[in-house]
Amino acid sequence: NDMESLEAQLKKCEPDKVKLIVTDGVFSMEGDVANLPEIVRLAKKYDATIMVDEAHGIGVFGRGGRGVCDHFGVSDDVDLIMGTFSKSFASLGGFIATDKEITNFLRHHSRSYIFTASITPASTAAVMAALDIMESEPEIQEHLWELTNFALDGFRQMGCEIGHTSTPIIPLFIRDNN
């Protein structure tokens, strides 16, 4: 999430070479949210492609749980959005949302795609049901945020060191063995 470092790396790249910025939407260790608006700005400035892993953002951020890209209104500026169905969807498998050209490339060159089995019909049905619930019952997402804020406030009142998280990922830092 260090934009100065990212820009320094992009400046080092040859202008005519492909540049890929890969980031989590929500970083799983400390719950930091990626600065996607700034990443998009830098990607446009340096003609870079953006890939966002929404594993911890889907179901939590954005309209109907669409993720951090939607939360910041940059979904159309992100070239690849990927995620898992094993967290918010309580199922199996995952997804990559991208354009047709990249999809075809991935289908023909990704070993993990070529040498894997398809998602089962039952897992697909579970994902579809979860999507319907996320869309039709926004109060579930609102309740998640109420519980998150309650937990954050409680940990802070107890004097726990939780860093700067503002997400449901709450790290508890323990600095010694006592």
Where are these regions (language model features)?
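Active-site phosphate-binding strand-loop segment of PLP-dependent enzymes
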Residues: N1-V52
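Short, small-residue-enriched loops and turns at beta-alpha junctions
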Residues: M3-S5, G25-E30, G57-V60, Y113-I114, ...
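Short beta-strand
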Residues: K19, M82, T116-A117, C160-S166
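Active-site PLP attachment segment
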Residues: D70-F105
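Structural motif of enzymes handling amino- and sulfur-group chemistry
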Residues: S118-E137, H143, L147-L152, R156-Q157
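Conserved PLP-binding catalytic core of the aspartate aminotransferase-like
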Residues: E142-A151, Q157-N178
